[in-house]
């Protein structure tokens, strides 16, 4: 004869195996997603949720109850099986219905719809009366069956409680709201006035900055005008210098090729850009000094060949 405890132990083993499978599925999913996890934390969280859902949904008790029914049937006690003849058809249909019901119960439990809410919704329904604010509470067939089976109790503590009617002092409420409104209005006005003062200060700073910028722009314009005038004066001076040197060069008794060479150097001076003009004049002066140095060395050599001596006075 099969003991009832053996059947219940088999069901408990199946439930524990389902829990282990849930833990493995959770950790495997986290690993596939590349998420780091603490195994002990995952185990604790899954166990807490699993135990709550299995207990609150009634799935655990349902499976254990069916195990007891099966054990009693195997031991020759068919009372439980006979009581369930109204919903039994065949093992496949019953298994499918049980699976769907258990799945629904666990889904509702995981969404926060606990056993109390599910039982009350299954036992009662509300019917609205058209044109009235009241309604009729209707008992379902499940409630009727529970009454017949003696599964309904009356809690007198709720009946004896007296309903307290609160008297609302609307004037006091209005005064409180008015004070809150005035306080809020004052804070808004203070913030607005502060904002206005800040805006005025910002405008003053902006106008002051604009005046400074305007003054600096005027100074820059004056400096630009002075630089333009100075550049024009330098261009005129360099042009006069070149003309004066050319005139003086033509009055010298130098060979024509020497005059031509010097004139070419004078004409190469950049009269538009004063900086370049200074560089060109420096180059011209260096060339003249170099030519003078070469001429002096030639004269010195000739004097030595002629046995003459020279001296500066």
Curated annotation (Swiss-Prot):
Q: Where is this region: Interaction with host EIF4G1?
A: 208-313
Extract the CDD domains matched here: NSP3_rotavirus (cd20714)
Region listing for Interaction with host ZC3H7B, in residue ranges: 170-234
Pfam families assigned: Rota_NSP3
What is the annotated localization of this protein? Host cytoplasm
Chain segments carrying region Dimerization: 150-206
* GO CC, alphabetical: host cell cytoplasm
Write out the entry's keywords from A to Z.
Coiled coil, Host cytoplasm, Host-virus interaction, RNA-binding, Translation regulation
Molecular functions (GO terms): RNA binding
Q: Region RNA-binding: what ranges?
A: 1-149
An example GO biological process term is: regulation of translation
- Coiled coil ranges (UniProt) are 166-237
Superkingdom as given in the UniProt entry: Viruses
Family, according to the entry, reads as follows: Belongs to the rotavirus NSP3 family.
**Subunit-structure text:** Homodimer. Interacts (via the coiled-coil region) with host ZC3H7B (via LD motif). Interacts with host EIF4G1.
Alphabetical list of HAMAP family matching this protein: ROTA_A_NSP3, ROTA_NSP3
What is the stated purpose of this protein? Plays an important role in stimulating the translation of viral mRNAs. These mRNAs are capped but not polyadenylated, instead terminating in a conserved sequence 'GACC' at the 3' that is recognized by NSP3, which competes with host PABPC1 for EIF4G1 binding. The interaction between NSP3 and host EIF4G1 stabilizes the EIF4E-EIF4G1 interaction, thereby facilitating the initiation of capped mRNA translation.
Name of the featured protein: Non-structural protein 3
Source organism per entry reads Rotavirus A (strain RVA/Human/United Kingdom/ST3/1975/G4P2A[6]) (RV-A)
Q: What is the lineage of its organism?
A: Viruses, Riboviria, Orthornavirae, Duplornaviricota, Resentoviricetes
């Amino acid at each position: 004869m099969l003991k009832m405890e053996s059947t219940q132990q088999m069901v408990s083993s199946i439930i524990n195996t389902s829990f282990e499978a849930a833990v493995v599925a959770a950790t495997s999913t986290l690993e596939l997603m590349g998420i780091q996890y603490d195994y002990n934390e995952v185990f604790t969280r899954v166990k807490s949720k699993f135990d709550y859902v299995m207990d609150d949904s009634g799935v655990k008790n349902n499976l254990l109850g069916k195990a007891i029914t099966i054990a009693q049937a195997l031991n020759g006690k068919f009372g439980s099986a006979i009581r369930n003849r109204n919903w039994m058809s065949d093992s496949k249909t019953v298994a499918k219905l049980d699976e769907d019901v258990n799945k629904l119960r666990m889904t509702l439990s995981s969404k926060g719809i606990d056993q109390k809410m599910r039982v009350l919704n299954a036992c009662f329904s509300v019917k609205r009366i058209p044109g009235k604010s009241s309604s009729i509470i209707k008992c379902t067939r499940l409630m009727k069956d529970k009454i017949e089976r003696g599964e309904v109790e009356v809690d007198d503590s709720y009946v004896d409680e007296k309903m307290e009617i609160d008297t609302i002092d609307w004037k006091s409420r209005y005064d409180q709201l008015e004070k809150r409104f005035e306080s809020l209005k004052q804070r808004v006005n203070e913030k607005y006035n502060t904002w206005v003062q800040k805006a005025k200060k910002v405008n003053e700073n902006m106008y002051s900055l604009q005046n400074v910028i305007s003054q600096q722009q005027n100074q820059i314009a004056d400096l630009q005008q002075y630089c333009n005038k100075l550049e024009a004066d330098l261009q005129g001076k360099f042009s006069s210098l070149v003309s004066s040197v050319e005139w003086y060069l033509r009055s010298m008794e130098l060979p024509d090729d020497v005059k031509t060479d010097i004139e070419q150097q004078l004409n190469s001076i950049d009269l538009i850009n004063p900086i370049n003009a200074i560089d060109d004049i420096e180059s011209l002066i260096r060339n003249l000094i170099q030519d003078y140095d070469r001429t002096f060395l030639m004269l010195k050599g000739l004097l030595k060949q002629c046995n003459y001596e020279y001296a500066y006075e």
